[in-house]
């Protein structure tokens, strides 16, 4: 069975927007942990637009935060970018339910874990993610921040079938140089996971990738939800994470679902585990909890669903407290995935 997952770099325009939105969120929570934040971002060329709802004792300097994100990513001439903000207070109707400890919206959220990697994450997704992290760490004067990676893994043969990376580069860099650098990263990542290096390697298949970032594509928050999670290996409820404070169950419940799935796999209850939590706006308890172990369970799925409800406080307030979600640096979640990073409480 061939399965493909992708990841995008911190310089991808959609990820630039996610990072700006989470920079605003983190700044608000640092100054006022009770902040209610729902920020969206759009970037095109050198123009940034932020819009959303914000109720906080702190008013963030969105322009300065956006410029700091661009500087950290390594965007050329980041000082020339302009920004505009259209932000109002949170709706009183939404606030009424959240103030009582209820969910900030309806919806279903998924968490997943698998024993196929040390990170308890899908292997092709981790390969794509590790490759882009290595590319980021290696980045020289030859390469620019925008990049994407895609890995096709053959689960029956236990080997990498295809490794694809497209990376932005300077105009004066020869494509042969780019291919040598990127191919070296592919091999390095494959060997780190004890895998074959005789895969099909595709580097910048169009032959040239000079114009990138927001000058090549418009970026918007919430458009890389599969790259944020599990690379397509499990289902997704559709809700994005970045720019949302933890009262939004789109974010907090997805983190708790990951923790439960991870705990169950570590406990030996299953080799693969997908948790679904579903909520109604304004209500504290989930309306349903579902466990799917894809036939790998050692404990009945119904019993695992009951265990999840007994062992974990699944109210929004309980999740926030258990995972310390008002103290998380969300800047570190906004690129290269929200899961499989050991520094976060939902990975512990």
Residue ranges and their predicted role:
Residues 1-38, 43-44, 125:
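N-terminal, positively charged regions that mediate nucleic acid binding
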Residues 4, 45-47, 64-212, 332-335, ...:
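Glycine-rich, mobile lid/loop segments that gate access to catalytic sites or pores
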Residues 19-23, 126, 130, 252-259:
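Short amphipathic alpha-helical face segments that pack within enzyme cores
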Residues 30-31, 265-271:
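Secondary-structure transition/capping motifs at alpha-helix termini
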Residues 38-56, 281-285:
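Short, charge-patterned binding micro-sites
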Residues 44-45, 270-272, 276-348:
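Internal helix-turn-beta structural module
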Residues 172-264:
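Glycine-rich anion/phosphate-binding loop at the beta-strand->alpha-helix junction
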């Amino acid at each position: 069975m061939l399965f493909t997952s992708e990841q995008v770099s911190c310089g991808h325009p959609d990820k630039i927007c996610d990072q700006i939105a989470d920079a605003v969120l983190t700044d608000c929570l640092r100054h006022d942990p009770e902040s209610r934040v729902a920020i969206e971002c759009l970037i095109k060329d050198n123009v940034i637009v932020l819009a959303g709802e914000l109720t906080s004792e702190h008013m963030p300097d969105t322009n300065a935060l956006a410029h700091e994100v661009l500087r950290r990513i390594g965007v050329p001439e980041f000082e020339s970018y302009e920004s505009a903000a259209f932000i109002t207070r949170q709706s009183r109707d939404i606030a009424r339910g959240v103030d009582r400890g209820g969910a900030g919206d309806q919806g279903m959220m998924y968490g997943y874990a698998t024993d196929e990697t040390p990170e308890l994450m899908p292997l092709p997704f981790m390969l794509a993610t590790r490759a882009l992290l290595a590319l980021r760490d290696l980045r020289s004067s030859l390469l620019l921040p925008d990049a994407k990676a895609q890995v096709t893994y053959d689960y029956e043969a236990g080997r990498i079938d295809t490794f694809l990376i497209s990376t932005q580069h300077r105009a004066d860099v020869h494509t042969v140089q780019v291919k040598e650098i990127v191919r070296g990263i592919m091999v390095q990542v494959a060997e780190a996971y004890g895998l074959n290096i005789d895969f099909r390697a595709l580097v910048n298949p169009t032959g040239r990738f000079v114009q990138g970032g927001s000058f090549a594509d418009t970026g918007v928050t919430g458009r890389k939800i599969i790259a944020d999670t599990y690379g397509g290996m499990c289902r997704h409820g559709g809700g994005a994470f970045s720019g949302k404070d933890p009262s939004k169950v789109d974010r907090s419940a997805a983190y708790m679902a990951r923790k439960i799935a991870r705990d169950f796999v570590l406990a030996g209850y299953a080799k693969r585990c997908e948790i679904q939590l579903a909520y109604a706006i304004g209500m504290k308890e989930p309306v349903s909890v579902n466990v799917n172990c894809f036939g790998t369970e050692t404990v009945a799925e119904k019993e695992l669903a009951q265990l999840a409800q007994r062992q974990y406080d699944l109210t929004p307030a309980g999740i926030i407290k258990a995972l310390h979600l008002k103290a998380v640096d969300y800047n570190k979640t906004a690129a290269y995935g929200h899961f499989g990073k050991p520094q976060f409480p939902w990975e512990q």
